[in-house]
């Protein structure tokens, strides 16, 4: 928001000698940051004076252009004979060439004389052009860097604000330059500062001076006027239609209006547009003007019909959404409420009668509409932040009065439909601001601050009953008022106090567990990666997973970074596959990489409710939202390819295989003290004969093994690439909370080896578990050290060889005790697994 200081001073009684820097500092400390201070006309130097055109002779040129040879009175000082004039001896004035069509006899103009320097370092000097010595320049607004003037050069009335112009006097004070303009960064929560009225109120409060409110009126209720209006939507609380007729649209806009809106960052167009923009900048209330002759029947405020179209002022045919709020007449939609008007009722050069619209629209409705149509405007920026509802009527009346004053219009009676909505009420403890801000502000000062902010305050004991002013929709709950008090006393007055130490709680059990797991995987030789959490249909097709797999339950992004990957990942493997292929393209062929991260699986079809923003959602609504969220388990995955150990002088290379994939899961389980069971399984994308299910506490938490050749080919991975993926949250949750530390026995160990023959379908883990049960408490450890399949054990049979370590806690085991324990273990394996002792 750009704030010209002269406009600000029209509303605020700033003390004499108040500098712009002081105003900027006060505004920054209490309300919004002043990003910079611009100086309009600050580059102008030299003689720039008021001139009076005594004569103007049009002279057509060969190129078809018409120039004016003007004799300009610039006062006794600059008309003197000592200055070059290029006109007859004894004749007053200077000769100046000008091509502007409004350089006519009798006009009062701004003249840059030789020696003046304009913006960009453009120096003025006498020079011969079009057959004459041009002794200066008649200036346009853009040439002075103070605005835009499509009519040509600047022309002034003979009297400006009661001052009779005199040829030769300094023109810059007449033009109001140089003028300082504040560039204020208005954040979304202080939408009322999108107006001069709002900024002026904040400056007055910050500097403890008087504020003159040009829109200080009481709310107006329904009024039956000549324009028929029907409001059919709750998204419009009040609508004002004010007819203005007999208007001369060709009348020039007063210079004070064009100067102010130009310095505020807007371009002058014509009287109606300039006046509505001026009032919007002044009050914060957007207005819209309809050509009354093109409005048929009743003006209706309603939601758009399905498939309805509107040709907007930017000449774009828009298909409306049923949630769009529109202004319509008997012919259909004539405007997108709060955003942009329609071309059918646009004010043109032939317009003589208009209907001024002032309305209060729902901020969310306007915000959604302009985002839906990608049609931001000055009006929508203000409506979405909240507009003072009282100004809907007062701003329309103000604009109509200006049109009557400067355009000769006649103002009719307004039609007012709806009421100004009531503002929220709140009760707070008088000491709440001090408790939250850490200040010691007396209650009397709190009341004074809120009252100056426009809040109606009623003190009852230790409580303050508060009613927000109409221009402050941001004051809703108690803490909004606390923030208001903090801003108004100045955050620079609040001393920095370190919060008391609550004692370090440390990491949670889950955090400690995850760190141990990640550290163990890194120590095993793997490199951690972080990949983007997005996948596409092609990624899922590469994995070869079935349609009912939970990894197909994707969450689609509304605005994906990459249209080919519009889903949140349901597995970590695609990201690792992309990372591996990228590294291979850079000649990195031996890779062992892993990633831990969240995946997202929409396993519940429920849709999350959309609560309003005006109140806290209930516990039931929050529970429904949580229930509709996708499952988000934290997973760990790794991919291994190439050589596990490269060729070296003391041995051959070791190729990576499925055992290294299983190693990742085993290392993770060992780091947590969790018993991991591995069992043959079939699961995409792994090879059906080289895939192990990873089981903890009887539940499958993941899989490991060699990838299916088809998957390897589609993903562009090296042959025999292996992978593992498991639920890290489930593994960490299974970690024991504590354990018993067994005493270290000083007695020798007894070692027994057994080789058992079982069917190929029997899992080695089942045999191992049977041996543990049969051996009893003397078994210290057991290890599978050999697997054999061949003629010696028969078809569909395999031999599993285990090493049993036996030790007594209080004695040395005898040979017979060791043999008995071994036999008991074998007997249990025979009983449960059908195992036979291999001879």
Swiss-Prot record:
Query: Where do the annotations place Mg(2+) binding?
Result: 474, 480, 483-484
Q: What is its main location?
A: cytoplasm
Q: What does the record give under GO molecular function?
A: ATP binding; magnesium ion binding; phenylalanine-tRNA ligase activity; tRNA binding
Give the subcellular location.
Answer: Cytoplasm
Sorted UniProt keywords: Aminoacyl-tRNA synthetase, ATP-binding, Cytoplasm, Ligase, Magnesium, Metal-binding, Nucleotide-binding, Protein biosynthesis, RNA-binding, tRNA-binding
Record text on cofactor binding: Binds 2 magnesium ions per tetramer.
Subunit composition and interactions:
Tetramer of two alpha and two beta subunits.
- The protein here is known as Phenylalanine--tRNA ligase beta subunit
- The record lists the organism as Cutibacterium acnes (strain DSM 16379 / KPA171202)
Q: Which gene encodes it?
A: pheT
């Amino acid at each position: 928001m750009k704030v010209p200081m002269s406009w600000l001073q029209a509303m605020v009684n700033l003390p004499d000698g108040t500098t712009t820097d002081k105003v900027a500092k006060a505004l920054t400390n209490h309300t919004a940051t002043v990003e910079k201070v611009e100086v309009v006309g600050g580059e102008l130097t030299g003689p720039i004076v008021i001139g009076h055109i005594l004569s103007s002779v049009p002279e057509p040129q060969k190129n078809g252009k018409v120039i004016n040879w003007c004799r300009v009175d610039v006062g006794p000082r600059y008309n003197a004979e000592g200055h070059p004039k290029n006109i007859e001896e004894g004749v007053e004035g200077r000769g100046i060439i000008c091509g502007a069509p409004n350089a006519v006899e009798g006009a009062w103009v701004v003249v840059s004389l030789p020696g003046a320097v304009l913006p960009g370092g453009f120096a003025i000097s006498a020079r011969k052009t079009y057959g004459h010595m041009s002794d200066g320049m008649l200036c346009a607004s853009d040439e002075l860097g103070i605005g835009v003037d499509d009519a040509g050069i600047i022309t002034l009335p003979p009297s400006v604000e009661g001052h009779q112009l005199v040829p030769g006097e300094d023109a810059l004070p007449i033009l109001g330059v140089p003028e300082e303009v504040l560039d204020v960064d208005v954040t979304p929560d202080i939408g009322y500062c999108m107006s001069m009225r709002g900024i002026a109120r904040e400056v007055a409060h910050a500097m403890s001076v008087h504020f003159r409110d040009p829109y200080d009126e009481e709310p107006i209720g329904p009024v039956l006027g000549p324009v028929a209006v029907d409001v059919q939507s709750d998204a419009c609380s009040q609508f004002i239609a004010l007819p203005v007729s007999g208007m001369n649209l060709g009348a020039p806009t007063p210079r004070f209006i064009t100067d102010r809106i130009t310095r505020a960052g807007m371009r002058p167009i014509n009287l109606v547009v300039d006046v509505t923009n001026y009032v919007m900048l002044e009050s914060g209330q957007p207005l819209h003007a309809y050509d009354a002759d093109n409005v048929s029947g009743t003006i209706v405020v309603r939601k758009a019909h399905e498939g309805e179209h509107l040709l907007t002022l930017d000449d774009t045919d828009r298909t409306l959404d049923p949630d769009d709020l529109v202004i319509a007449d008997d012919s259909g939609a004539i405007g997108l409420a709060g955003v942009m008007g329609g071309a059918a009722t646009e004010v043109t050069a032939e317009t003589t009668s208009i209907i001024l619209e002032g309305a209060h629209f729902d901020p969310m409705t306007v915000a959604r509409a302009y985002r839906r149509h990608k049609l931001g405007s000055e009006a929508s920026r203000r409506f979405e932040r909240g507009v003072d509802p009282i100004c809907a009527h007062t701003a329309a009346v103000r604009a109509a009065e200006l049109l009557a004053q400067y355009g000769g219009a006649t103002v009719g009676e307004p039609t007012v439909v709806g009421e100004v909505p009531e503002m929220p009420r709140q009760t707070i403890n008088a000491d709440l601001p001090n408790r939250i801000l850490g200040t010691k502000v007396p209650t009397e000062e709190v009341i004074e601050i809120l009252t100056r902010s426009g809040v109606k305050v009623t003190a009852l004991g230790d409580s303050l009953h508060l009613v927000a002013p109409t221009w402050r929709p941001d004051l809703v709950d108690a803490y909004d008022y606390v923030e208001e008090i903090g801003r108004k006393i100045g955050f620079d007055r609040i001393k920095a106090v370190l919060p008391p130490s609550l004692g370090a709680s440390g990491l949670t059990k889950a955090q400690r567990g995850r760190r141990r797991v990640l550290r163990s995987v890194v120590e095993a030789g793997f490199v951690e990666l972080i990949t983007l959490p997005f996948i596409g249909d092609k990624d899922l097709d590469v994995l070869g997973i079935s349609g009912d797999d939970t990894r197909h339950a994707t969450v689609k992004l509304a605005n994906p970074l990459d249209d080919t990957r519009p889903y949140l990942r349901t597995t970590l493997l695609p990201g690792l596959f992309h990372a591996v292929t990228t590294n291979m393209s850079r000649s990195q062929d031996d890779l062992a990489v892993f990633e831990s991260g969240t995946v997202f699986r929409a396993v519940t079809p429920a849709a999350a409710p959309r609560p309003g923003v005006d109140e806290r959602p209930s516990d039931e609504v929050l529970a429904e939202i949580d229930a509709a969220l996708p499952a988000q388990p934290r997973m760990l995955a790794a991919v291994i390819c190439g050589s596990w150990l490269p060729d070296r002088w003391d041995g051959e290379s070791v190729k990576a295989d499925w055992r290294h994939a299983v190693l990742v899961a085993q290392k993770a389980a060992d780091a947590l003290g969790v018993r991991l069971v591995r069992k043959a399984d079939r699961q995409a994308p792994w090879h059906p004969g080289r895939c192990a299910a990873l089981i903890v506490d009887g539940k499958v938490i993941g899989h490991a093994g060699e990838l299916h050749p088809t998957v390897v080919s589609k993903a562009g991975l090296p042959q025999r690439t292996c992978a593992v993926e498991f639920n890290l949250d489930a593994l960490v949750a299974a970690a024991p909370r504590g354990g018993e530390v067994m005493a270290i026995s000083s007695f020798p160990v007894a070692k027994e080896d057994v080789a058992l023959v079982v069917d190929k379908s029997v899992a080695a883990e089942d045999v191992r578990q049977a041996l543990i049960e049969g051996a009893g408490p003397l078994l210290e450890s057991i290890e599978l050290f050999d697997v054999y399949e061949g003629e010696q054990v028969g078809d569909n049979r395999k031999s599993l060889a285990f090493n049993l370590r036996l030790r007594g806690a209080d004695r040395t085991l005898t040979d017979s005790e060791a043999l008995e324990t071994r036999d008991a273990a074998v007997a249990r394996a025979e009983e449960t697994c059908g195992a036979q002792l291999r001879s």
